[in-house]
Swiss-Prot record:
Gene3D superfamilies on file: Ribonuclease Inhibitor (3.80.10.10)
The organism of origin for this protein: Xenopus laevis
Keyword Nucleus: yes
Disordered as annotated region, ranges: 1-39
Subcellular location: Cytoplasm; Nucleus
Tissue distribution: Expressed in the neuro-ectoderm of embryos.
GO cellular component entries: cytoplasm; nucleus; SCF ubiquitin ligase complex
Name of the coding gene: fbxl17
Top-level taxonomy: Eukaryota, Metazoa, Chordata, Craniata, Vertebrata
Protein name, UniProt field: F-box/LRR-repeat protein 17
Amino acid sequence: MGHVAPHASKKEHVAPHAAEKDHVAPHASKKEHVAPHAAEKGQVAPYAAGEGQVAPNAAGERPVAPYAAGEGQVAPYAAGEGQVAPYAAGEGQVAPYAAGEGQVAPYAAGEAQVAPHAAGEGRVAPHAAGDGQVEHCTVEDREEGHIGTTEQGHMSHYTSKLEHMAPPSAQTEAVVSYVAGERHAPPDCTVSGPAMCCSAEARQTTPDWTTTGPEISQGTLPGLTVLHVGGTWQTFAAEDEPCVTTLLSPVKPLSSSRKYAPYNLQIPSYSESEPQAHKGLSSETFGPCEPLHINQLPSSLLLKIFSNLSLNERCILASLVCKYWRDLCLDSQFWKQLDLSNRQQIKDNILEEIASRSQNITEINISDCFSVSDQGVCVVALKCPGLVKYTAYRCKQLSDISLIALAAHCPSLQKVHVGNQDKLSDEALIQMGRRCKELKDIHFGQCYKISDEGLIVIAKGCQKLQKIYMQENKLVSDESVKAFAEHCPGLQYVGFMGCSVTSEGVINLTKLKHLSSLDLRHITELDNETVMEIVKQCQHLTSLNLCLNRSINDRCVEVIAKEGRSLKELYLVTCKITDYALIAIGRYSKSIETVDVGWCKEITDYGAKQIAQSSKSIRYLGLMRCDKVNEATVEQLVQQYPHITFSTVLQDCKRTLERAYQMGWTPNASPAT
């Protein structure tokens, strides 16, 4: 037959992966030919075609450029008359990953079949040894540029022009597993040494093969050359040990027709010793390649995936898939921060089981869980001594027993938010003040039995407090305010909405140099002078809420605008102010971003226009039920100052509808009349 260069394309020459009569090359398709991963005679593996069809990347009388379709050709992702699109199964064809009667799923090998890189009579496998098969050549053959025969009719090959491929002192071997046909361009690649290509044409076309790009990772199969973690090609022998590693980065395409050629190229790196990449490989080396099941992933990786699920998704969906997933969903790391709020099915027994499975719970929220009793909370306190945050709003069935248990067994408690619990009294607060020295954040809104007695104990015992919020606690007076101002100098957030405090107690808050947020809503005996003094003394104040205080007037707001240099939020709903207050804010304040003057009956169009025009910092202006502000004026301001959000009934409705449309909501079509 004569000598054949590896990339020659004459009829009686043999190139790796080239197809001639009675020979089968990977990715080639002729009548009675079998492409890699294909099964019985007359069947077609993925990316292959049947009689009269051409598989992409195949060589023969009808070479096909990848992704291009012409007469008698098949583009990999296009199907026309007499053509086969990949992953499509027709008569006498096999869809990948599907096996039926007379069909073979990919990666399976049987009689008259060829596994990738395997050897059989009359077949060409690039890295296997058998009759009529191809082996790689050594550098000593480089001068001759031919294919020489070895014992038992074996053939060795190499590219006739390798002068540019290897340093003078190195031995070089190159096995090209994707080149076939009469005319072809060399694929792109990046190697761990000087640039390598397969012909002079390639050197002219692509002078620099090294490019950059994100690394790509795929799985590895024994005996196959695959793209491995880290952006390298690795050839694996039967023992699943890497024999050849070639650095690879995603490369720029050589041409549009060979865009993805680099991922089918196999080039061993330079080596001073005899390479071992293809030693002892045979058809028995390769077992069937099974797709990786998700449960074969390391448990640590599955836990990381499950951490992105919500509690409902883990408990209701993922845990029902299989026992393994259920066990993973019960891992203690998922039970540190529990939000069980508004779940009526949560009862004491469920709470006890959760606490028994994970004693690492640090946060728990049982708001609106009306079936949880003091007993369930006591079990949590006993079994979870590391509890840091406890939230229980509107659990009217709970009493002092719950908080006393938490105070006794959870010394690290830092946050306690308990609201609207009629049974809670000073007894629980006294125990917390004596035991919970790390307490930093407490909310006791609408707990009507709490008085100064319990709060003073907390103020004296929990001097690390940073936030305190009381709401409608009529038994809380100026004494509590004085105690917190004296014993808790680190307070940053203070709220006494609707409590029985007066200006006499509030003035003590000027001692809090770190105060940043102050909520004084609905304090009937609050005068303007007290508010102005607090703003002057507390230079770090960023939020001030004075809603529902009819005593606050324009003069007070003017001083706030001048002195509150750090102030960003000012709430004045239902205060006794006029347009002058808005004009003063726009004129004097360079920091205020949010102003709400809803239900202020004396605010008119003029005030709204002036603050929008003069203020450089304003971003939100609340005008809800300011009846003297014309909606047409607001619409004009919206168009003129798009960086400001104007809040009125109509504007809020428009924004709500707009968000609904963005989320895919459509109004019901009116019935035909």
